[in-house]
UniProtKB/Swiss-Prot annotation:
Belongs to the TrhO family. Gene3D superfamilies: 3.30.70.100, Rhodanese-like domain (3.40.250.10). Residues 315-354 are annotated as: Disordered. This is tRNA uridine(34) hydroxylase. GO terms for biological process: tRNA modification. Residues 315-328 have a biased composition (Basic and acidic residues). The active site is at 200 (cysteine persulfide intermediate). Residues 146-240 form the Rhodanese domain. One of its GO terms (molecular function) is oxidoreductase activity, acting on paired donors, with incorporation or reduction of molecular oxygen. It catalyses: uridine(34) in tRNA + AH2 + O2 = 5-hydroxyuridine(34) in tRNA + A + H2O.
Amino acid sequence: MPVLHNRISNETLKAQMLAETEPRTTISFYKYFTIVDPQATRDALWVALTQLKVFGRIYLAREGINAQISVPESNVEALREFLYGFDPALAGLRFNIALEDDGKSFWVLRLKVRDRIVADGIDDPSFDASNVGDYLKAADVNAMLDDPDAVFIDMRNHYEYEVGHFENALEIPADTFRDQLPKAVEMMQDHKDKKIVMYCTGGIRCEKASAWMKHNGFNKVWHIEGGIIEYARRAREQGLPVRFIGKNFVFDERMGERISDDVIAHCHQCGAPCDTHTNCLNDGCHLLFIQCPSCAEKFAGCCSEACVEEHKLPEEEQRKLRAGRENGNKIFNKSRGRLNTKLGIPEPESSEKP
């Protein structure tokens, strides 16, 4: 039986990707549909996508598929044709093409089977995830932004909202999508007469969130078709004003796509205008934070003096320190609380209801 997972080191794979000469296209897509056997589907996809030289991250569950990938430009149409024919539910699948792309977003293919393609924490058997809000296209989004009865709700994480969002969009103060869902209902409970517009990066979170709002008695619910990525692309193509301000955070090596020239965030170390995310170079930390070029040089890519000193230690000493920390210091934990603790950033004031 063939090996259906990667067995080459990340370092080697990254070097191979960087040495490639053919341009790559970064694509995201998702689809809610019933997958009877996610593991068998995963294995079949692995074989086909490996042949197409696809890199990236794909999650499968009984509720559907969620993918962020890169593919050689010459294979984009072959990938589209393969997916359209792979399952009837994928016929006509929308590809969200990256707005800014150097082709270096991924260097390894990972396919994982999960309980859900979006961790929503919903265990209500009466919830119908297919009963979603109506789609909004780019022109409709701009019209809604000018409608005083419309409320835009950002269903992304705090670090995504911080660097870019729609004008006057409501931030839901929670560290995870599963925590945002009940908070969104709570914050809008007294405003069921409002028109609610949900949005996220590529559409997968806001689609489910729109169904959750309808499940909780909200009737005027929309979500942006294809999320921020598709909105910005279509608005530019149609010559419409792009009303998203700042940068769109993305979950790959790029960490962001510039949507407007506005820089609305600040360096977490010195406070200078900046919207460049990075991970602390100390392997015992890897805190996700915003760092300007000056502080990157001053702190050698680390988030604090303590991490600078630890990063200077011999690798063996660093490993011993990491092993002695409870839960590995919660590496890759992106919670606002951890960011505030590490960098002394005060907790934001609670978002106001509309």
